């Protein structure tokens, strides 16, 4: 789909407030409308203006955030760490095939204290009708089988340890030894597989960042619903391959 790179940044930007998006521009497409609504909801879901103008959408939330920071500083006092607060948002078109498009949302916030917080999430949108897929791309049995696959993926690809015990030592939840938790965040389709995302503090300490692992499509083939399989088959079409060649990892 056609997009336009747009940004909003407060000037002067003492608060470090910036929002950016690869904004869908085809007003006649149902998938465009669904992606725009998703962006609006990711930012708070309170903007009531037309979504045809992405710059106004970003300006609304950027201004709202900057004004809130100023009010907080005035209430708490000027000599606080909030004087160097930051808010950064970026919506990216991460992957596209002839049948679906993946968008990601990256948000970083800092309002004083030892460190800021960041989040990563996304959505997989079917082009034909705009339907957004998340965990429902997998069957119920498929999701249960994913627990062990994700655990092994995190062990070898993210934490880079050799044993389950070494992995458990890096996690916050002792129960992960018995039932490995699935991420609360919906999985997203990338050029080389499905990415599974845990947010900060969800399963590991802050120092671990955002634990993720990407499992190749062929390893998940029998776990997808029949609804999702045609979309997965499109991950090797000509449009998909313009993003990256298929990589096994």
Question: What is each PLM-predicted segment?
Answer:
Residues 1-249:
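Compositionally biased intrinsically disordered regions enriched in Thr/Gly
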